[in-house]
A protein has these predicted regions:
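Short, highly charged, low-complexity non-transmembrane loops/tails of multi-pass membrane proteins
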Residues: 475-485
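Membrane-interface helix caps and helix-loop-helix hairpins in membrane proteins
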Residues: 120, 184, 211-216, 240-246, ...
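Transmembrane-helix bundle of Major Facilitator Superfamily
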Residues: 2-205, 340, 347, 353, ...
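12-transmembrane solute porter fold
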Residues: 31-53, 66, 72, 163-164, ...
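Residue-level signal for the membrane-embedded core of alpha-helical transmembrane segments
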Residues: 82, 136, 228-231, 302, ...
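Helix-loop junctions on the cytosolic side of multi-pass membrane transporters
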Residues: 201-222, 243, 266-275, 465-476
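Phenylalanine-glycine-rich, low-complexity intrinsically disordered regions
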Residues: 211-212, 227-250, 265-266
Length: 487
């Protein structure tokens, strides 16, 4: 029998019936939502970091230097950041599950293109297609969870989602290192395509979600302005390391990018159907959560990339050894993210959004080269553990407070805005790595990168304390089920 509001744990209660299809029918609907949402999101988060430790091997095989390494990461992030906001309206227009299927197909196709790449340009193109698909998956999965669970069960559900996706995000460098050392960097992309096939099949396990009361419209002008603004700005930041700021193409790209972003804000203020409803930013907790997200994701992206490059290119560690040092993050996330979500729901998210980023920043400052030699166990591991603790304290409450600050009907766009904020921040952070490191990772530039990353975390902690309020939690009825029994 299907229960009305089961626990969001990822587990299945089977009634004893003959045959696997009968067992599938008895899986609780909300657990089906959790399974699909977590599977598709895990791969997106995993692919966001799995390439970090493969960058040196990719550069040795295809060439291109640090600029190409930055583009391999930023090509993916750029596509996500540019597409995720119009993706919310597109999902409402065509249905969340059909659009999720499109995202799965696009992500899989991009993975195949990247796997067979023979040039840096082809690899970057594959990453762009991956990002296009990924933009429809993470916000859609959070919107499904938000619709499937009532207010009482939602924090634990988001905690479970965060535990698994956070683990995927954190374990990505380790899997990337193992794949590079024992297979090839190309297998990173081959293995990314397989879960997309499984996820595509599982979406037929769910029934279509209720559509909006009004037919949504896609903000084409807003999407174009934001895409041009982000692409031109990131191009200028990355390519300035190769051509210099006195190059007319670089300065022109920066001017075009900034102008397009300013025009985007002006357009959204007067558009009848804006891609970003600016009225949401009058909600204190929504604005605070997104600003904190920007600094936290910028800090973790820059710090993680700096550590991955330094350990291999300067300290001389293998990709696997460099990946092993990331283990504290997935362990902490898997063990404690769900519990942190429940605790934040009881005592409020504010203390977590102050403490978490602060601890993460301190952890990064503990990682530094020493004049008497460098060893990952003594010089990296303590800081990585503290960084992992800080991230697990911050991420679940950050996601929960963003969704809790808006009505359920706006959960899709709220999730999309937060995802776009985090991706855009990560995009800019990666683009700035070359500027801060002056094109080369050394002891001095590595320390400088970690200091900048820590500063981003500290700013996020201050904003979390000043901008976030612990909300009163009113009772909310259990929503309608999203999933339907398998026919």
């Amino acid at each position: 029998m299907i229960t009305a509001q089961p626990s969001p744990r990822i587990g299945f209660a089977f009634v004893r019936k003959a045959g696997p299809l009968a067992k599938l029918r008895d899986v609780a609907p909300t657990r089906r939502v959790m399974l699909v949402a977590i599977l598709v999101s895990m791969v997106v988060f995993l692919d966001g970091t799995v390439v970090n430790l493969a960058l040196p091997a990719t550069e040795r095989d295809l060439g291109g230097g640090m600029c190409s390494q930055q583009w391999v990461v930023d090509g993916y992030l750029l596509a996500v950041a540019a597409t995720v906001l119009p993706g919310g309206a597109i999902s409402d227009l065509f249905g969340r599950i059909p659009v999720m299927r499109f995202g799965l197909v696009a992500f899989g196709a991009g993975s195949v293109l990247a796997a067979i790449a023979g040039t840096p340009a082809m690899l970057i193109a594959g990453r762009l297609v991956q990002g296009l698909g990924g933009a429809f998956l993470v916000p859609g999965s959070l919107a499904l969870i938000n619709s499937a669970f009532g207010r009482a069960g939602r924090p634990a559900a988001i905690g479970s989602w965060t535990a698994w996706t956070g683990t995927a995000f954190a374990v990505g460098p380790l899997l990337g290192g193992l794949t590079v050392d024992f297979l090839s960097w190309r297998w990173i992309y081959v293995l990314s395509a397989i879960p997309m096939i499984i996820g595509f099949a599982l979406t037929f396990w769910l029934c279509p979600t209720p559509g909006p009361s009004e037919r949504p419209r896609v903000d084409v002008a807003g999407a174009a302005l934001s895409s041009v603004g982000l692409a031109a700005t990131v191009y200028a930041l990355i390519e300035s390391g190769r051509h210099g700021w006195d190059d007319s193409l670089i300065t022109g790209a920066l001017v075009v990018g900034v102008a397009a972003l300013l025009a985007f804000v002006a357009w959204e203020r007067r558009a009848s159907h804006p891609m970003v409803p600016l009225g949401l930013f009058t909600i204190r907790n929504f604005t605070g959560a997104n600003v904190v997200s920007a600094f936290v994701y910028g800090g973790i992206t820059m710090g993680s990339l700096a550590i991955a490059l330094y350990l291999q290119e300067v300290a001389g560690y293998s990709a696997t050894a460099a990946g092993l040092i990331t283990l504290p993050s997935p362990i902490m996330s898997l063990l404690f993210a769900r519990g942190v979500g429940g605790m934040a729901a009881r005592i409020g998210p504010r203390i977590f959004l102050m403490t978490g980023p602060a601890l993460a920043g301190i952890g990064l400052l503990l990682i530094r080269p020493t004049p008497h030699g460098f060893h990952v166990v003594t010089d990296v591991l303590p800081g990585r553990i503290l960084l992992a603790i800080g991230m697990v304290l911050a991420i679940t409450p950050l996601t929960a407070v963003n969704l809790a600050s808006v009505r359920s009907a706006h959960s899709g766009i709220a999730a999309a805005i937060q995802n776009a904020t985090g991706r855009t921040s990560a995009l800019i952070a990666v683009a700035c790595v070359g500027l801060i490191a002056a094109g080369t990772v050394t002891d001095a530039t590595f320390t400088r990168l970690l200091q900048v990353s820590a500063a981003l975390f500290f700013i996020g902690a201050v904003i979390g304390g000043l901008a976030i309020r612990n909300p009163a939690v009113p009772a909310e009825p259990v929503p309608d089920k999203v999933a339907a029994p398998v026919p």
